[in-house]
């Protein structure tokens, strides 16, 4: 080697230790203020709001995926010269946080009622200040480049003001109202809960079929079936399909209730499926969503038979006071005693909604609640996408968006909790009510509504409330609308749709239009929807399956860069992502490869310098620089389209398969030949590669780039621009032919039993005709060959077809005599053959197992088929080689 080592070569350790380096690098970024956004900047703006995680929680693998993608987007835009705001914050998580504090009180034998509302809320604030910061530390460990100076909480005073402001505007516009309607009720928490807080799972229950009306088959009667037989105490009708001939003569009549002094109207309703069961359904309007709709259509009575704790009430029967599950048995037994039970299926597997927080089956229940009238709001949210004001990525998710917003039901926004934004409605002594805005004072002696708002209400204001709305602020002017929302497709309705509804509702507000200097705005111009994280078998992660992985565990094992690269590499738009420890280990190995390549380049003098003119560059130089430009363009295209997987795959294969595996090896040959300009090409390639990788692998690239360039930080470095270097097709073909020739010679050597790097004399024919004269030194070095001596006698040879049309031939003759221990080679091959045959038998057995094929995910079966194919090829190769050694 003729080049001197780079002065910074000794600055790098001999190996990369993420645990020792990443936290220090992150602190350096914070101290330098790289992530602090300046609303007075003249740079173009780019802004993202972080979907606020629950203050009670910790980062799960879905968060890690989401944060990796947002960090990659903002880091790239910062390097492209944008003024970037990545807005962090946490959600007050009403039910979750109240539950945590109530559990702490329970340890001391106390309840929230013992403290009273005001002291309990103070207690929750104390908990938040002491224990609510865990997520921030985890985000730092992951490398999130958020603006911590702007960290917000959905119960901050500024955000509370925004909540009260929009509530009053919606109320004054007639879009918030109070009504008794059906909700998901949690008897344990004693509050309404949102659909998102209901988890459905299959349970083994019972299906009871019983008859209303006469026990005499010749007299009017109808058989119905239910899994919640206790709700028959609230039945007010029986519904049949209008075209069902079996019941047409009964429509308009009624049947007596066996336990309650009530006649059950027989109504015709198209909701009923005449092909299912008996074609007749019991109607309990106060305790079933479909029955409620039937009740509204037919103006049925809606008696509520369950109290807030799930006990039977107000039926006037002996069942009053019973728990719902106790009543289920008692009512069934009472029906059986009358001879009304026709059939009992037990166990009967069916799906039941359970409270995510408290775990018990939820109860649909008629309840007086506050609601948002969504029709006009949902239409505006839908129109924003139809008109192109907001673009959803991938486009395949648009139908799901429209299916939500075009068929949205009014939104229940009240919760029977103490922790949260209190509903700003006040009641007078004679039942009067008034909505009190943030700058108004309630009438003396009036009482405030005890309920709080659904957590999703305040988080729906997140894109603009965090920027200071309803006040006119420099942040709203600079960073609103936000550039892109990155979130999971699973909360498209619960969060995204509601942000769009509220965002379009205030879109023409003076604080947002800048007093009319710009038109109405949407909350974000792009929405990128990512998929869910699954385990390596393709199963959704859940605590019940025991397959949940803490991302911080993998960060500790492999480093944040390795986890981030794994997640980004697997993240295709809208597609789910399977992760495994092996995948993260492979990403760690990729980082090690980059580290070793950079260290090697520095030790051999790589340093930024002007590149020589193209005619001074070698084929290898022109090839690698041309490929680098192609990769840069592909990475730009991929990031612009939120195709993180495509960007990472392109960078991975270029860095590993082309730059490290080929160009570095060719650079050794060039440096040995005295081509000192090679150090500039090495540095140029590494410089651009590290910049392109930085958004996804920020820590390692920062350390390597600083060593290479001696400059301030990659965070503030420029993003690679088009280099103007086009692909030299002639040089690229020569390199492609050289690579094929080296690969074929190496494979042939292996088949001959030669060890890697064991040099043997060889002679090549047809090199000049194949336009490879300038590549002989590279082939000789990389294929571990030596020049033939005067007494060279070839013992084996191979032909390699080259050229774009495979019409050029290079013949390589090798003298392997005396280089192979035949007996030892046979023993080695026989051992390999036994292993290949064992793998072949194992995979064949699995693929012949019908039970396994029926249950295993397609991805697992595909992997086994691949293993079988490889084992078959290995068996054939080794068998052929053994035969040649006879």
Curated annotation (Swiss-Prot):
One of its GO terms (cellular component) is cytosol. It is an enzyme of class 6 (ligase). A motif ('KMSKS' region) lies at residues 540-544. ATP binds at residue 543. Residues 819-851 form a coiled coil. Keywords: Aminoacyl-tRNA synthetase, ATP-binding, Coiled coil, Cytoplasm, Ligase, Nucleotide-binding, Protein biosynthesis. One of its GO terms (molecular function) is valine-tRNA ligase activity. PROSITE patterns: AA_TRNA_LIGASE_I (PS00178). It is found in: Cytoplasm. It catalyses: tRNA(Val) + L-valine + ATP = L-valyl-tRNA(Val) + AMP + diphosphate. InterPro entries: aa-tRNA-synth_I_CS (IPR001412), aa-tRNA-synth_Ia (IPR002300), Anticodon_Ia_Val (IPR033705), M/V/L/I-tRNA-synth_anticd-bd (IPR013155), Rossmann-like_a/b/a_fold (IPR014729), tRNA-bd_arm (IPR010978), tRNAsynth_Ia_anticodon-bd (IPR009080), Val-tRNA_synth_C_sf (IPR037118). It holds the Pfam family tRNA-synt_1. GO terms for biological process: valyl-tRNA aminoacylation. Belongs to the class-I aminoacyl-tRNA synthetase family. ValS type 1 subfamily. Monomer. This is Valine--tRNA ligase. It comes from Mycobacterium tuberculosis (strain ATCC 25618 / H37Rv).
